[in-house]
Amino acid sequence: MPSIDLQERRKQRLRFQLRAKANGRPRLSVFRSGRHIYAQVIDDAAGRTLAAASSLEKPLREQLRTGADREAASAVGKLIAERAQAAGVSAVVFDRGSYLYHGRVKALAEAAREGGLAF
């Protein structure tokens, strides 16, 4: 299917641009599925995840109606910002993957900025 190939090419192109701009900063990676949204702060130099959050976590599942809306993305953004700062990370590079900066991805990014992450 050509759409999968194009999506993969878009993701790789964006990831290459991020590596050039990163200057040693960790990457805030976003993955969204039909039912949930996930975020990770990844240190590519060390090859390890510094912080992670998702709408699957029990405290968020109890307070959210669903894991697939902008409200859930905002909650995950605030949570990833708290956890990243607890891990000593204050500046990141935002990796939206192959997703447009719109809707849930935008809500997560704005909540992470409000939570104190700089990007």
From Swiss-Prot:
GO process annotations (BP): translation
Name of a matching Pfam family: Ribosomal_L18p
Keyword field: Ribonucleoprotein, Ribosomal protein, RNA-binding, rRNA-binding
Disulphide bond pairs: none
GO CC annotation terms, alphabetical: cytosolic large ribosomal subunit
Family annotation (InterPro entries): Ribosomal_uL18_bac-type (IPR004389), Ribosomal_uL18_bac/euk (IPR005484)
A GO molecular function held by the record: structural constituent of ribosome
Subunit structure of this chain's protein: Part of the 50S ribosomal subunit; part of the 5S rRNA/L5/L18/L25 subcomplex. Contacts the 5S and 23S rRNAs.
Role: This is one of the proteins that bind and probably mediate the attachment of the 5S RNA into the large ribosomal subunit, where it forms part of the central protuberance.
Stated family: Belongs to the universal ribosomal protein uL18 family.
The protein, known as: Large ribosomal subunit protein uL18
Organism: Granulibacter bethesdensis (strain ATCC BAA-1260 / CGDNIH1)
Gene that this sequence comes from: rplR
